[in-house]
Amino acid sequence: MIYSVYIIYSKSKDMFYRGHTSDITDRLIRHNGGREKATAIGLPWLLLWCTQKSNKSEAYRLEMKLKNLSRERLIEFMLKYEDDIAGPDALLFLKQWSGC
């Protein structure tokens, strides 16, 4: 089964959330529907970055690595793996954040 590792952002809370899931569409609906405790505040959440892993343990390991990065390092990471950025708006947002 394929798992997605993703990073979402809340402008209202100015915070990032990192997670993994087997169904990214459903997970984003749950985040933006206030049905996830960790993200119930801070709506709406914008998908910035998403990649796929071949199994749950790989996805979990990457999620834990991402959770240990500072905000600056997290943005650098997303820009380094630009192919996984979720569209031109997300790319522009990240480049503005990084000062590029």
Model-derived segments and their meaning:
Residues 1-53, 57-67, 72-74, 78-100:
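GIY-YIG nuclease catalytic motif and its immediate N-terminal context
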